[in-house]
Amino acid sequence: MMSQLTHINASGEANMVDVSNKADTVREARAEAYVRMAPETLQLILSGQHHKGDVFATARIAGIQAAKRTWELIPLCHPLLLSKVEVQLEALPEQSSVRIESLCKLSGKTGVEMEALTAASVAALTIYDMCKAVQKDIVIENVRLLEKSGGKSGHFKVDA
Protein backbone atom coordinates (compact mmCIF):
# COMPACT_ATOMS: atom_id res chain seq x y z
CA MET A 1 0.00 0.00 0.00
CA MET A 2 1.25 3.47 -0.86
CA SER A 3 1.91 6.02 1.87
CA GLN A 4 0.10 9.34 2.02
CA LEU A 5 1.63 12.40 0.39
CA THR A 6 3.27 14.22 3.30
CA HIS A 7 3.37 17.66 1.67
CA ILE A 8 -0.41 17.89 1.12
CA ASN A 9 -2.69 18.91 3.98
CA ALA A 10 -6.29 17.82 4.59
CA SER A 11 -7.53 20.64 2.31
CA GLY A 12 -5.30 19.49 -0.53
CA GLU A 13 -2.89 22.41 -0.17
CA ALA A 14 0.87 22.08 -0.41
CA ASN A 15 2.73 22.74 2.84
CA MET A 16 6.18 22.20 4.27
CA VAL A 17 6.14 19.18 6.58
CA ASP A 18 6.52 19.96 10.30
CA VAL A 19 9.57 18.00 11.47
CA SER A 20 9.95 19.75 14.84
CA ASN A 21 8.88 16.68 16.86
CA LYS A 22 11.13 14.24 15.00
CA ALA A 23 14.33 12.96 16.56
CA ASP A 24 17.68 13.70 14.96
CA THR A 25 19.09 10.62 13.25
CA VAL A 26 21.98 10.08 10.87
CA ARG A 27 20.61 10.19 7.34
CA GLU A 28 22.38 9.44 4.11
CA ALA A 29 21.35 9.28 0.46
CA ARG A 30 23.07 8.41 -2.81
CA ALA A 31 21.82 9.33 -6.28
CA GLU A 32 23.11 9.00 -9.82
CA ALA A 33 22.77 10.54 -13.26
CA TYR A 34 24.26 9.77 -16.65
CA VAL A 35 25.34 12.17 -19.38
CA ARG A 36 25.52 10.58 -22.84
CA MET A 37 27.52 12.33 -25.55
CA ALA A 38 29.49 11.74 -28.72
CA PRO A 39 32.81 9.91 -28.26
CA GLU A 40 34.62 13.02 -29.52
CA THR A 41 33.03 15.17 -26.83
CA LEU A 42 33.97 12.72 -24.09
CA GLN A 43 37.53 12.57 -25.43
CA LEU A 44 37.71 16.37 -25.38
CA ILE A 45 36.77 16.31 -21.69
CA LEU A 46 39.19 13.51 -20.82
CA SER A 47 42.12 14.98 -22.73
CA GLY A 48 41.89 18.24 -20.79
CA GLN A 49 41.67 20.16 -24.06
CA HIS A 50 38.23 21.67 -23.38
CA HIS A 51 38.48 25.44 -23.81
CA LYS A 52 36.37 26.08 -20.68
CA GLY A 53 38.73 24.14 -18.41
CA ASP A 54 38.35 21.06 -16.23
CA VAL A 55 34.79 19.88 -16.88
CA PHE A 56 34.77 17.23 -14.15
CA ALA A 57 36.13 19.58 -11.45
CA THR A 58 33.58 22.24 -12.37
CA ALA A 59 30.70 19.74 -12.40
CA ARG A 60 31.79 18.33 -9.03
CA ILE A 61 31.81 21.78 -7.39
CA ALA A 62 28.48 22.67 -9.02
CA GLY A 63 26.92 19.48 -7.64
CA ILE A 64 28.20 20.18 -4.15
CA GLN A 65 26.93 23.78 -4.28
CA ALA A 66 23.55 22.59 -5.58
CA ALA A 67 23.11 20.11 -2.72
CA LYS A 68 23.66 22.93 -0.23
CA ARG A 69 21.06 25.09 -1.99
CA THR A 70 18.36 22.49 -2.66
CA TRP A 71 15.98 24.22 -0.27
CA GLU A 72 16.12 27.32 -2.50
CA LEU A 73 15.23 25.33 -5.62
CA ILE A 74 12.61 22.85 -4.40
CA PRO A 75 9.81 24.82 -2.71
CA LEU A 76 8.91 22.47 0.15
CA CYS A 77 12.41 21.25 1.06
CA HIS A 78 13.81 22.19 4.44
CA PRO A 79 17.09 24.09 4.71
CA LEU A 80 19.55 21.47 5.96
CA LEU A 81 22.91 21.57 7.68
CA LEU A 82 24.64 18.96 5.55
CA SER A 83 27.64 17.29 7.15
CA LYS A 84 28.93 15.70 3.93
CA VAL A 85 28.42 16.13 0.20
CA GLU A 86 30.42 14.10 -2.28
CA VAL A 87 30.12 14.06 -6.07
CA GLN A 88 32.04 11.50 -8.09
CA LEU A 89 32.29 11.49 -11.88
CA GLU A 90 33.32 8.45 -13.89
CA ALA A 91 33.95 8.40 -17.62
CA LEU A 92 32.46 5.37 -19.36
CA PRO A 93 34.14 5.43 -22.79
CA GLU A 94 32.49 2.19 -23.95
CA GLN A 95 29.08 3.85 -23.42
CA SER A 96 30.26 7.30 -24.48
CA SER A 97 28.91 8.70 -21.24
CA VAL A 98 29.74 10.03 -17.81
CA ARG A 99 28.25 8.50 -14.66
CA ILE A 100 27.74 10.88 -11.75
CA GLU A 101 27.14 9.62 -8.23
CA SER A 102 26.37 11.90 -5.32
CA LEU A 103 26.32 11.25 -1.60
CA CYS A 104 24.73 13.51 1.01
CA LYS A 105 24.78 12.98 4.75
CA LEU A 106 23.65 14.72 7.94
CA SER A 107 22.40 14.19 11.43
CA GLY A 108 18.95 15.74 11.46
CA LYS A 109 15.18 15.51 11.36
CA THR A 110 14.61 14.99 7.63
CA GLY A 111 16.18 13.04 4.82
CA VAL A 112 18.70 14.13 2.20
CA GLU A 113 17.29 12.39 -0.89
CA MET A 114 16.43 15.64 -2.64
CA GLU A 115 19.89 17.03 -1.94
CA ALA A 116 21.55 13.94 -3.44
CA LEU A 117 19.26 14.05 -6.49
CA THR A 118 19.88 17.77 -6.93
CA ALA A 119 23.65 17.32 -6.68
CA ALA A 120 23.69 14.63 -9.39
CA SER A 121 21.30 16.60 -11.61
CA VAL A 122 23.18 19.90 -11.42
CA ALA A 123 26.52 18.18 -11.99
CA ALA A 124 24.98 16.68 -15.16
CA LEU A 125 23.57 20.05 -16.22
CA THR A 126 27.00 21.60 -15.71
CA ILE A 127 28.59 19.06 -18.04
CA TYR A 128 25.93 19.91 -20.61
CA ASP A 129 26.51 23.64 -20.17
CA MET A 130 30.26 23.34 -20.56
CA CYS A 131 30.00 21.10 -23.64
CA LYS A 132 27.01 22.55 -25.50
CA ALA A 133 29.26 24.63 -27.76
CA VAL A 134 30.72 21.44 -29.25
CA GLN A 135 27.59 19.24 -29.06
CA LYS A 136 23.97 20.28 -28.65
CA ASP A 137 22.36 16.81 -28.49
CA ILE A 138 23.97 15.65 -25.23
CA VAL A 139 21.48 13.55 -23.24
CA ILE A 140 21.02 13.63 -19.47
CA GLU A 141 19.33 10.41 -18.38
CA ASN A 142 18.56 7.94 -15.63
CA VAL A 143 18.59 10.38 -12.73
CA ARG A 144 17.53 8.33 -9.72
CA LEU A 145 17.88 7.70 -6.03
CA LEU A 146 20.19 4.73 -5.43
CA GLU A 147 19.99 4.40 -1.67
CA LYS A 148 18.80 6.15 1.47
CA SER A 149 19.15 5.33 5.12
CA GLY A 150 17.98 6.78 8.40
CA GLY A 151 14.67 8.15 9.53
CA LYS A 152 11.24 6.61 10.03
CA SER A 153 11.01 4.97 6.61
CA GLY A 154 14.29 3.10 7.15
CA HIS A 155 16.65 1.82 4.51
CA PHE A 156 15.98 1.83 0.77
CA LYS A 157 18.29 0.53 -1.94
CA VAL A 158 17.52 0.04 -5.63
CA ASP A 159 17.80 -3.47 -6.99
CA ALA A 160 21.02 -3.95 -8.93
UniProtKB/Swiss-Prot annotation:
**What one GO molecular function would you report for this record?**
cyclic pyranopterin monophosphate synthase activity
Q: Which reaction does it catalyse?
A: (8S)-3',8-cyclo-7,8-dihydroguanosine 5'-triphosphate = cyclic pyranopterin phosphate + diphosphate
Q: What class of enzyme is it?
A: lyase
Q: Where are the transmembrane segments?
A: none
Look up the EC number in the record and give it. Answer: 4.6.1.17
Q: Does the keyword Lyase apply?
A: yes
Q: Which GO terms describe its biological process?
A: Mo-molybdopterin cofactor biosynthetic process
Q: Which InterPro entries would you find in this protein's record?
A: MoaC, MoaC_bact/euk, MoaC_sf, MoCo_biosynth_MoaA/MoaC, Mopterin_CF_biosynth-C_dom
Q: Which UniProt keywords apply?
A: Lyase, Molybdenum cofactor biosynthesis
Family annotation (Pfam families): MoaC (PF01967)
Q: Where does substrate bind?
A: 76-78, 114-115
Q: What is the role of the protein in this entry? A: Catalyzes the conversion of (8S)-3',8-cyclo-7,8-dihydroguanosine 5'-triphosphate to cyclic pyranopterin monophosphate (cPMP).
Protein family: Belongs to the MoaC family.
The name this protein goes by in its record: Cyclic pyranopterin monophosphate synthase
**Native species of this protein?**
Vibrio cholerae serotype O1 (strain ATCC 39541 / Classical Ogawa 395 / O395)
